[in-house]
Amino acid sequence: MNENLTRRHFLAATGTAALAAATTSALAAEGGSGGKPLKILGVSCSPRKGMTTAKAVQAALDAAKNSDARIQVELIDLGGLNIAPWSPKPPEDDMKDILPKFQDPALGGVIIGSPCYFRSLSGLAKCFLERLAPLREPKMVLADKPFGVVTVGTFRNGGQELTIEQIQAILLCYGMIPAGGRPPAFQGGTVLSTKDEISGDELGLGTARNTGLRVADLALRLA
């Protein structure tokens, strides 16, 4: 058991390093770090501000930022904010300050993070993603922009990949391009929280970093 776990940690660590090296080499071949800056927004859709989901998304953002000088990042923590579901009459809530960030011409990609509640995305994540609806009409503002998903559960197999699939299905409705991860998590970041802490899950944090690197790589290639 311990031997298998050690092997998984080794594969995760080497996979992250290999992806970072490949991304750096590819970007260098395309002309180095010149060009316009690109913003990658990370959104923590946990009602608990600054907790494990926010930390996991930040790990993905840090990896993205460190991959190329053109990448700028920003974490949007929805914890403690009031965001209602979509309605024909737009609610007056905190979404009014968030939506303009997704209309920024410099936006290159998005990373969405959600805790796994009952093997599903959080209610806050669902409300937030619904409220991006104004970006679909009359123009698909987010079309052809890459996105990644990072999820946090209290069990290793606690619904993380199911939650990723649910968020991917929603963002495909916005015309966005899903960016997966690398072994051992091909769909995105799958992080384990133990007693409100993720720092001990190097395997899971590696998948979050891989997701950030993939989003950054695609954003730069599509720019």
Predicted segments, located by residue:
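N-terminal beta1-alpha1-beta2 submodule of the flavodoxin-like/Rossmannoid cofactor-binding fold
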Residues: 2-5, 11-138, 186-223
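Short, glycine-/small-residue-rich phosphate/pyrophosphate-handling segment
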Residues: 143-184
